[in-house]
Amino acid sequence: FYFNTGGPGYVLSHATLRKFLSVADDAEHCSSEETTSAEDVMMAKCLRQHGITVTDTRDKLGRERFHMFMPGMQYNWDLTQKNWYTRYNADWGLKNKADCCAPDTVSFHYAKQPAMIRHLHALLYHCDPSDSLSETANHINSNFSNISS
């Protein structure tokens, strides 16, 4: 069973959202009475029962765009761990380090603190390899001097 994790957020087409809203009360396939805190799994099961399947959101190299964890944890993931996340990704394999994240990443789960968001913004939009290091560093430091992890 494949589903897109809901932690980092959802991206649904207008048609899919309309369909979900029209079938969400289907107690047999979309029951919110099932005992689970995993609403993303419930949503995927509900949509699947109504003919809507999820799309693989990884890039052509298999790097994720929607991440289950914060950037540091995603990057440093120990591929030898035996847990639910490793088992869930067994069919297509986990990636870490430079291969963990697609360049057009959409979101990270747990990145909720304002300082973390500013830090990510600075890394994504103000670190230009064509700039000199000092220009980039000065820009980031002057605009985001209160960043903490």
What do these predicted ranges mean?
Residues 1-149:
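Secretory-pathway lumenal glyco-enzymes, predominantly type II signal-anchor Golgi glycosyltransferases
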